[in-house]
Amino acid sequence: MNQKEINELRRRFRPEKSAISRVYGCYVNSSKEIVSDLDESLGMMPQEESEKYLSLLKKGLSGSLGKNLIDIVFSTQQVADSEEHRLLTTLWDSQLKDNEARQTFYHKVIDSLDMGDSSYLLLLTCDSYDVPHRGKDDSLQADASDEVFTYIVCVVCPIKEGKVELGYFPGDNEFHCAAEQTVAPPELGFLFPAFDDRAANIYNALFYSRKANEIHQEFIDAIFHVEAPMSAVEQKEAFQSALSDAFDCSLEVMQTVHEQLCEKIKEHRESRSSEPLEMSASEIGQILQSCGIADEQVAAFQENCGEQFGSGVVLNPANLIDSSRFEIKTPEITISADPEYSYLVETQIINGRKYLLIPAEDGVEVNGFAVGITVAQKDD
């Protein structure tokens, strides 16, 4: 799926556009026991409550592609005959009305998911989208629909315990201490089937993780039974390892790599392309060559990438660097700079000692106080 297709589905979760009639799910306590089973009509709820449910479900389609939203790909064999795909298909075909399939799914999630000591609300819903035709000018023509896309969305929301406060209990006509429980935004979730080329693709699902460094591999293995993809944090660490194992990285090389990857990210953002940004290891190798890195070291980097990520892999630069800052650390000091001005940081050896140099003209502040830079006078 691309960003445009995700955005198109996200708009379905607005109250004025939603055709979702029911939500299903269960409340699971910290002992992995189902406390309550949910089967509710949105139309019978107060509007404020139904909007809360839609908002939680919509969160399962938020974040960045390749970082929070990850493609799950089923093998042909899985689609043809596998327990995991058969269960998802049963839920989908029945539009979640098959109670036995729902209960089987709930217990699969409960048995596998590690949420620590947190209780959680598991939510499921189904929507049928009358897909409008998209014109040559990219506009949607609602009266020219020729396909209905039916899909299910699942989200897992932690239950947060509020602070203990004194409150009034009308039944007792007394004040007592109590802590309110609230449903937090989803920690993870998925959409099935994928909405590829604006049509159902049963060979794919879209997985959501709120934290890019915690993608709940145990859930992916149990529900989809596929090899969990590398998280964005793991990709960044693997990229750093591929670089450092190939050659000794200098500040100047890392400045150039960071600068050029930032430029690629900026160009992609400005292009408003719906497809995720991708670069091959050989394209990054060309950046290294422009820094003066020897051909054999560039080849070693590309080989390392193959070992770390797999043969012929394409990389998303947004997962390899933090494009919002350029940070340099020593054991005692951290320097954080706007990537646009990272070139101002230089290295120099003075009297045998290594230094990081930053030009300091006007506008220097220390803890919010404006200060001047003076030259210390040496005693004769």
What residue ranges belong to the model's regions?
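Soluble regions of membrane-associated proteins that transit the secretory/organelle pathway
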Residues: 3-7
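C-terminal, beta-strand-rich globular interaction domains
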Residues: 275, 287-380
